[in-house]
């Protein structure tokens, strides 16, 4: 494909996806020419152009720009900034997107989100080709089938771009990755371009919020709902009310919040936000293990969930009852200490107890899962007692956030090559301690070798299964009450004093 064919194909793509109207074809060509810094064009339909997918079309244009020195470097960071600028030139204006979403929402919230999710892929804001590279599988555990993924969709930064980014002046704009200032932002070497990014307003519990999708799509229709105001994460009564109001308006979605303390919280604590989507996690499928009840709330069904972490599930017809009871449990947990169970509410004035809440609809009912969290550290566990312990850092050492709490492991990209190397050495019997790719996995791999009859046909399946089992053990470590008779007794001690 030459440049003219690629521009023609991109305009046809924008027409097909309804990003532009038929009458805007000439305008669209000129927008693309401006980005390409090219001043000649003739409309060229070609078989190649008609067959090409969006990634191939954009790659052709980026290569052309690099060959003509319009693009300074040919690395992923520069290419991403450039192709986002190209797509941004064809993305409808923010108000057009908002109006379309609101118009569809009047028909049904699901029609609105269906359209908006597809739109976010059509503009290449969600890079489907990259998301497809993520490695995913399911592992059967005593808690049901959990999801494992090795993230490949976040591109690795190249050394040249990292070096160039160091020389850029510091900037506090946009204030963070979530703020509405990202809409249409051109990006820079150390900040992603967002010209093709559009958000839609939603009112939750009488406050102004926005809805968008995650560009990394860890699960189906992975959305982010964020406060219009850049304000810190806070788990409180208003948070429960917002979560339940969200699932009232979008009953086909679940929504949850990361905890509001370091170690047990998410990566963005400075901007209040939730994550949701159209997906059934293993935790949602997990049954109630022990029924419980709270005085004065006998109409609320409550129970301890059969899950590696410590989860109280509440279910009621009226969201108000859940909000009141959840607030009561939160208030009690914030101030709760049980030294015998290694739970301290605070040390030196620093609070440790919080909750990761998740809301959903169960038929017509409203349901709230409250996951008890504690971020206490000790000299033996400087990253947190209720955090992946060092023995499992070869697989997972990052924080256990909302998505993982629910049973979806987001494992680091390095594991793709490392686990492939482990598989090769399990088959060949080579020493793992001498290869930097397998060194950290050597002890774990030796246990695998001792427990299985390994063949070329089953090695991948076995390594994936054992990786999933490690993740379930990591979740057990993140649970404040262990799944032992003593742990159960301590959990009930807390519940009984609420």
Regions inferred by a protein language model and the residue ranges of each:
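Helical scaffold of the NTase/Pol beta-like nucleotidyltransferase catalytic core
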Residues: 196-198, 230-255
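Catalytic or ion-translocation cores adjacent to nucleophile or general acid/base/metal-coordination motifs
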Residues: 238, 247-270, 276-330, 334-337
């Amino acid at each position: 494909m030459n440049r003219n064919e690629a521009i023609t194909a991109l305009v046809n793509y924008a027409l097909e996806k309804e990003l532009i109207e038929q009458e805007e074809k000439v305008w669209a060509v000129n927008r693309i020419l401006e980005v390409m810094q090219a001043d000649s064009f003739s409309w060229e339909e070609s078989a190649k152009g008609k067959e090409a997918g969006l990634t191939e079309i954009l790659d052709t244009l980026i290569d052309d720009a690099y060959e003509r020195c319009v693009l300074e470097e040919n690395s992923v960071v520069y290419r991403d900034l450039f192709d986002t600028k190209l797509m941004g030139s064809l993305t409808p204006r923010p108000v057009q997107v908002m109006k379309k979403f609101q118009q569809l929402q009047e028909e049904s919230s699901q029609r609105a989100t269906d359209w908006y999710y597809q739109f976010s892929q059509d503009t290449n804001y969600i890079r489907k080709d990259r998301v497809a590279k993520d490695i995913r599988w399911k592992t059967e555990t005593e808690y049901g089938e959990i999801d494992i993924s090795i993230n490949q969709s976040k591109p690795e930064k190249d050394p040249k771009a990292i070096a160039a980014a160091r020389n850029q002046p510091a900037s506090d704009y946009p204030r963070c990755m979530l703020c509405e200032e990202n809409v249409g932002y051109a990006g820079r070497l150390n900040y992603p371009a967002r010209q093709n990014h559009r958000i839609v307003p939603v009112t939750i519990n009488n406050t102004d919020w926005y809805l968008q999708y995650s560009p990394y799509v860890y699960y189906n229709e992975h959305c982010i709902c964020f406060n219009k105001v850049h304000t810190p994460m806070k788990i409180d009564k208003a948070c429960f009310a917002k979560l339940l109001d969200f699932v009232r308006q979008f009953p086909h979605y679940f929504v949850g919040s990361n905890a509001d303390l370091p170690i047990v919280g998410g990566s963005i604590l400075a901007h209040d936000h939730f994550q949701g989507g159209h997906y059934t996690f293993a935790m949602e499928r997990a049954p109630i293990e022990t029924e419980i009840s709270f005085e004065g709330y006998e109409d609320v069904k409550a129970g301890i969930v059969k899950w590696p972490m410590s989860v109280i599930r509440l279910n009621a017809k009226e969201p108000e009852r859940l909000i009141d009871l959840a607030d009561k449990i939160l208030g009690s947990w914030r101030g709760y200490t049980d030294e015998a169970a290694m739970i301290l509410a605070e040390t030196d004035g620093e609070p440790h107890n919080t909750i990761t809440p998740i809301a959903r609809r169960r038929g017509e009912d409203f349901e709230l899962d409250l996951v008890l969290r504690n971020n206490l550290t000790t000299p033996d566990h400087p990253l947190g007692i209720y955090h992946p312990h060092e023995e499992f850092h070869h697989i997972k050492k990052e924080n256990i956030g909302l998505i993982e709490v629910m049973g979806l492991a987001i494992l680091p990209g390095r594991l793709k090559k490392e686990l492939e190397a482990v598989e090769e050495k399990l088959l060949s019997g080579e020493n793992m301690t001498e290869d930097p790719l397998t060194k950290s996995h050597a002890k774990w791999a030796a246990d695998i070798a001792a427990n299985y009859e390994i063949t070329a046909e089953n090695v991948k399946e076995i390594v994936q299964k054992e990786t999933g089992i490690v993740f379930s053990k990591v979740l057990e470590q993140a649970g404040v009450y262990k799944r032992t008779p003593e742990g159960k007794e301590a959990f009930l001690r807390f519940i009984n004093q609420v």
